[in-house]
């Protein structure tokens, strides 16, 4: 409801960020480190790139072309939107612990793979400045 209430005529994307994160301490630490690294490497002004609560104007989606097909797509998307001049509004969203199961991400091989993918994305977007062509 907060995301919908934040939509205005001058807003291209309403981006959520987690509040009251209901995770174990080690996930909070890893998540915080990840977000600081992402903000530093990609110069992002978004508070939480991986919060999946977002409303995006179709016209903004039509301006960018995303190529990632892994977990770094959220970083590519936010970086591409920011470069396209998108106007962001950020809204806090409640975050709850998983009632069942475990995340597959918080294992060393997955963390390593994500780190490598993040560096590859950094090289493509920040060094080569290759954000891809706009969609036709």
Which stretches of residues belong to each language-model region?
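Short, hydrophobic alpha-helical packing/hinge segments within bilobed ligand-binding/sensory domains
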Residues: 52, 77-78
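Catalytic donor-sugar/metal-binding loop of nucleotide-sugar-dependent glycosyltransferases
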Residues: 44-45, 66-69, 78-96
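A ubiquitous, low-specificity "background" feature that marks scattered single residues
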Residues: 54-56, 82, 123, 136
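Acceptor/aglycone-binding surface of glycosyltransferases and processive sugar-polymer synthases
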Residues: 1-71, 98-115, 132-134
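C-terminal, non-catalytic tails of nucleotide-sugar-dependent glycosyltransferases
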Residues: 117-136
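Secondary-structure boundary/capping motif
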Residues: 57-60, 86-87, 121
């Amino acid at each position: 409801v907060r995301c919908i209430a934040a939509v205005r005529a001058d807003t291209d994307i309403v981006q959520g960020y987690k509040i009251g994160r209901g995770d174990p301490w080690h996930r909070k630490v890893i998540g915080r480190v990840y977000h600081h690294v992402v903000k530093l490497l990609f110069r992002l002004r978004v508070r939480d790139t991986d919060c999946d609560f977002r409303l995006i104007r179709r016209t903004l989606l039509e301006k960018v072309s995303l190529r990632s097909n892994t977990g770094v797509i959220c970083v590519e998307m936010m970086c591409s939107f920011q470069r396209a001049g998108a106007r962001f509004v950020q809204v806090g969203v409640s975050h709850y612990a998983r009632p069942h199961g475990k995340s597959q991400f918080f294992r060393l091989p997955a963390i390593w793979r994500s780190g490598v993918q993040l560096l590859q994305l950094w090289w493509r977007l920040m060094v080569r400045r290759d954000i891809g062509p706009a969609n036709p």
